[in-house]
Curated annotation (Swiss-Prot):
Name of the coding gene: mntH
Species the sequence originates in: Aeromonas hydrophila subsp. hydrophila (strain ATCC 7966 / DSM 30187 / BCRC 13018 / CCUG 14551 / JCM 1027 / KCTC 2358 / NCIMB 9240 / NCTC 8049)
GO process terms (BP): iron ion transmembrane transport
Ranges that cross the membrane: 16-36, 43-63, 95-115, 119-139, 152-172, 193-213, 239-259, 288-308, 318-338, 346-366, 387-407
Topology within the bilayer: Multi-pass membrane protein
Protein name in the entry: Divalent metal cation transporter MntH
Amino acid sequence: MQPALTTAIPARKFKLTLLGPAFIAAIGYIDPGNFATNIQAGSTFGYQLLWVVVWANLMAMLVQTLSAKLGIVTGKNLAEHIRDRLPKPAVWAYWVQAEIIAMATDLAEFIGAAVGFKLLLGVTLLEGAGITAVVTWGILMLQSRGQKPLEFVVGGLLLFVAAAYIVELVFSRPHLPSLLEGALFPGLPNSDAVYLAAGVLGATVMPHVIYLHSALTQHTQDQGSVPQRLHTTRVDVAIAMTIAGFVNLAMMAMAAAAFHSSGNQQVAELESAYQTLTPLLGQAAATLFGLSLVASGISSTVVGTLAGQVVMQGFVRFTIPLWLRRAITMAPAFVVIAMGLNTTEILVLSQVVLSFGIALALIPLLILTGDRALMGEYRNHPVTQAVGRLIVALVIGLNAYLLVAMI
């Protein structure tokens, strides 16, 4: 019996070492853009749009699972596969749009963290941006020690945001029957609700983390068989995306309980949400909101920088030091802040830019993971392909609606 026990223990540890990449990807689903969208939806419509969060999160689970599977089975990430299959001019065009999307997303995330520091410390937005730059640089330096230290830090920040919103729910005391009804039964009260529902979904499927997740799992050939790695990855995605989904649900439920129920139905900006929370739920709740915004902004801007590195290396086989990429990508944020532009409008604009890249990441992902010649026995099941096509059509349609409505 002893030999069997001895081999079972390392096998269990082996699987545990594969957990982590999905936690990095999940950060993209709780960035400051999600904060702004969920708070606006909850304050305006109460619990009625919670079902959108539930379905959007289920879609995101499938998308991230397919991305991780592509890296595990083929040993190449999504950007590399696109590079291998398209002519050079198309590859360069793909790279440019992916970089623009990564930078636009990073802009909103960086500004979100700066807003959090401003609210918590009473500093100017420019000073908050400076603090954000120093902290994110420090976290990115962990990459020199390998992927695991970064996974621990980013995963820890994800868990902190989740814990903060558990406490926020306790403070706000949402009406449980209304919460369950909103989460389980779809409904769109009016055209404004359709617009916000499109915004919630548009802020959920993130093209930059689709590219990134396939890269985070591509170098795991020495960590077990393909079936073992796929199984562990499904668990990894399920845990990480469930946490991210809970955070989004909690954001909207807190806004519904704290703002909508008290008659504050026009809370759309992060600063006004913080200021409104103080008299309604107390300073502790407002401080937790600020801390969770900082944790979300810092972790998501780190992930955005990593995603930018992946798309550059994958599409054009070129890399630059992470500290230099961080300096380049944060420059637009400092320009926006110095110009005094509205931060919430910048968050919304980032979602518009993001919508252009969703189809360009999802469609090749679905084609590649459904390719028998490439994936062999691990190709997508026909049902998975059908669901994937439905998700692509839905995401593209709703994001097109969102884009047209904003113009």
